[in-house]
Regions:
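Catalytic cores of large soluble enzymes that bind and process phosphate-bearing ligands
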Residues: 5, 9, 46, 50, ...
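Short, charged cytosolic
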Residues: 34-61
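Hydrophobic alpha-helical transmembrane segments
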Residues: 96-113
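Short Lys/Arg-enriched alpha/beta "domain-start" segment
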Residues: 1-10, 16
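Conserved, well-folded catalytic cores of nucleic-acid-processing
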Residues: 20-24, 61-65, 92, 128-135
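Transmembrane alpha-helical segments and their cytosolic interface motifs
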Residues: 66-93
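Alpha-helical transmembrane segments of multi-pass membrane proteins
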Residues: 87-91, 111-123
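Cytosol/matrix-facing juxtamembrane amphipathic
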Residues: 13, 17, 27-43, 117-160
Length: 160
């Protein structure tokens, strides 16, 4: 399996893990993740036991067909899609509206529409390009905790 497919699958499991964690801990607690071919990181004030429980449950549920766990409304893909759409909408609106107040109004309108569209389009981008729930042979190998100052980071290594 190539590095991109591994990253997509780890990204999906990262989303599933964080989704389950967020359903079990206070909602005001910040959390983030980052995936690579060998596994993924979770940054947040959670215990290794909580990470292990959530990651293993997410993997089992995804292997049982719960593909929606791989998609997250908080994913960075949505931010990138929103930024790209807003930039394109602003530039096109200003250019087509003509320079001056009319162009500025059109640019702002286009940017607002682009930001509103970013979540559903970001979801499609996640489904097609950046995540995958297709992980029948995936295994969690190890979970390692690191403390960097105030930040708790867990590394979840996986294999296929």
């Amino acid at each position: 399996m190539n590095f991109w497919k591994k990253t997509q699958r780890n990204h999906g499991l990262e989303h599933g893990t964080i989704s389950l964690l967020l359903s079990r801990i206070p909602h005001d607690q910040p959390m983030a993740g980052y995936s690579i071919p060998a596994g993924f990181f979770v940054v947040g004030d959670v215990t290794t036991g909580q990470i292990s429980e959530a990651a293993n449950e997410a993997l089992l549920r995804m292997q049982a067909g719960e593909a929606n766990l791989a998609i997250s409304p908080f994913c960075g893909t949505n931010i990138v899609v929103g930024a790209a759409l807003a930039t394109a909408g602003t530039l096109i609106g200003y250019r087509l509206g003509g320079r001056g107040i009319r162009g500025i109004n059109r640019a702002f309108s286009n940017a607002a529409l682009a930001i509103a569209a970013s979540r559903p389009i970001g979801r499609i981008a996640q489904q097609r390009f950046t995540t995958s729930a297709d992980n029948p042979s995936m295994r969690i190998i190890d979970i390692t905790r690191y403390q960097l100052g105030k930040f708790t980071i867990h590394w979840i290594s996986t294999a296929f």
